[in-house]
């Protein structure tokens, strides 16, 4: 009996600090103090640096470093459960609002500035209402797509806890991919079979068409949207896939802590997408889930093709100037 009592007591210890834990909070057995700490750190603007230059001993029962204590919460499996993440429907609702804001700015606003990526991160550029009779060039559409995608990515929870350089790496690694995916899905919603800008123009500059084979043109303009058409991609699936792409822990040169934070948040959206597939497809849900994740590979191939297209500009310079943000993100 004594052994059983001792065993039960040890099983009711907080996974974070090893004090007595009364219940599961955010998915992990924890004490009230660690529960409240995790909630405050998630909802607030906690420190983004380790006070000991990442030399804290995380095996200590009590961590005075807030950042390392928060990282330990993530490592032990605490899940973010705020008003933003209460349920699958809430997750989708938040993503839909962010995407609607992004789309509204893309379609109805313009930016006269020529910022670098660092300038966009430090201080968001000023948008002004676009006259209804104003037509964008391909380079202007490209700039607005990248700019509004950076702003969209900045709204995600993980940006509060990443080092600034890690966030910059994420933007350089994923922004162009996400903007390309969004453009393909918008073209799909317009009943097109090739990727186009919002005004209906094809994405390949006319001055480069004579130097492209028909096979390459078909690949760069149709492969990604072809996969989307094949899947009959739904709006909710699209939103969750964007979130999964945003939280990419595989980008080169991320810190170990950055990878851990991104992996945690990506798993939240992976779980949400699987839950959606199971709800919509029943026993076929896991197969649908895998099919949707395969889009990531197609997006990567599309971006490689765009890279080849941009390389052609080395020999046939564009007739319009591309802004610095586009040059940085395309060069990533």
UniProtKB/Swiss-Prot annotation:
Q: Does the keyword Ion transport apply?
A: no
Record keywords: DNA-binding, Metal-binding, Nucleus, Receptor, Transcription, Transcription regulation, Zinc, Zinc-finger
Asked if the record carries the keyword Metal-binding, the reply is yes
Q: Which GO terms describe its molecular function?
A: DNA-binding transcription factor activity; sequence-specific DNA binding; zinc ion binding
Q: Where in the cell is it found?
A: Nucleus
Q: Which residue stretches are annotated zinc finger (NR C4-type)?
A: 14-34, 50-73
Q: Which domain of life is it from?
A: Eukaryota
In this protein, which residues make up the domain named NR LBD?
101-332
> SMART domains this protein is in?
HOLI, ZnF_C4
* Pfam families the record matches: Hormone_recep, zf-C4
Gene3D superfamilies (UniProt xref): Erythroid Transcription Factor GATA-1, subunit A (3.30.50.10), Retinoid X Receptor (1.10.565.10)
Residues annotated to bind DNA:
11-85
Which GO cellular component term is one of those annotated? nucleus
Q: Please report which protein family the annotation says this sequence is part of.
A: Belongs to the nuclear hormone receptor family.
**Biological role:** Orphan nuclear receptor.
What is the name of this protein?
Nuclear hormone receptor family member nhr-9
Q: Which organism is it from?
A: Caenorhabditis elegans
Gene name of the record: nhr-9
């Amino acid at each position: 009996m004594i052994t059983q009592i001792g065993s039960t007591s040890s099983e009711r210890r907080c996974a974070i600090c090893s004090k007595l834990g009364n219940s599961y909070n955010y998915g992990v057995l924890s004490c009230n103090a660690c529960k409240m700490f995790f909630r405050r750190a998630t909802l607030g603007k906690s420190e983004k640096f380790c006070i000991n230059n990442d030399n804290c001993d995380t095996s200590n029962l009590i961590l005075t470093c807030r950042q390392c204590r928060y990282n330990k919460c993530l490592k032990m499996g605490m899940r973010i459960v705020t008003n933003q993440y209460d349920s699958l429907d809430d997750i989708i609702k938040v993503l839909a609002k962010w995407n609607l804001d992004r789309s509204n700015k893309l379609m109805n606003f313009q930016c006269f500035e020529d910022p670098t990526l660092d300038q966009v991160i430090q201080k968001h550029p000023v948008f002004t209402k676009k006259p209804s009779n104003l037509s964008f060039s391909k380079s202007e559409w490209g700039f607005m797509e990248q700019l509004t995608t950076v702003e969209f990515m900045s709204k995600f929870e993980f940006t509060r806890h990443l080092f600034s350089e890690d966030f910059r790496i994420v933007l350089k690694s994923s922004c162009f991919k996400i903007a390309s995916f969004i453009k393909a899905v918008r073209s799909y919603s317009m009943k097109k079979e090739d990727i186009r800008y919002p005004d209906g123009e094809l994405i390949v500059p006319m001055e480069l068409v004579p130097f492209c084979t028909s096979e390459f043109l078909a690949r760069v303009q149709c492969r990604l949207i072809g996969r989307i058409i094949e899947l009959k991609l739904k709006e909710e699936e699209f939103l969750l896939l964007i979130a999964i792409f945003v939280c990419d822990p595989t980008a080169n040169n991320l810190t170990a802590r950055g990878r851990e934070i991104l992996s945690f948040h990506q798993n939240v959206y992976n779980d949400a997408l699987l839950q959606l597939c199971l709800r919509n497809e029943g026993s076929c849900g896991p197969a649908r889930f895998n099919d949707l994740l395969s889009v990531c590979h197609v997006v990567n191939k599309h971006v490689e093709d765009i890279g080849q297209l941009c390389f052609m500009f080395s020999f046939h310079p564009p007739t319009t100037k591309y802004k610095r943000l586009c040059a940085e993100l395309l060069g990533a």
